[in-house]
Amino acid sequence: MEETENMKHFTGRELPDNALKASMADGTPYVLPPWRVNDIILLAIETLSDVDYYRDDFDYKKMIREQGIKIKKFSAFSPDNLEKFRKISLSRWEEGICALFPHPVTGEQCRIIAYNENRNSIECMQIVFHEYAHIKLHHTQQSINGEVEATCFALAMTMFLLLEQLFHVGKTVVNAAGKPFLVQTIRNAIKQKEA
């Protein structure tokens, strides 16, 4: 049975095109409901709009660092330390790590994202956004739901940034009608599709 048929068999219905789906370890289908996909897309555009992502000098890593989150390449760690971070990571993905832990002296919450820099720039951005999503979506443990949500968030963030780089969509809309119009137009389009 192909994956689409498995999903139909498991859920008892055809899945909408915008359902994000994955398989759990035992092969049971996992589906992220369309309303949750929509919530995550809105969170992505709101996150980017809050920091004026359409500026020519926008740097996504700087945006994340300004929130007190450290970003490191895998090569910055010794193999032993990298393995320690993997064990406490919220992510189940081998390409990136998202670790939250108390500072040993101050007790303050430390947040770190580490990624495999041996990928092209778009893949690295996708990995960093995936790990950032675990923090942004307040995930507290590894789960298939967390992985699917993080993937959805990372795809939305990457899509908005690529559209901006290629076509200057955000800058054009903001210059013509203002930042609130950009976010509200996307929100309205999602609500209309849900109805």
Language model: regions and residue ranges:
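Active-site hotspot residues in diverse enzymes, especially metal/ion-binding acidic/histidine motifs
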Residues: 1-195
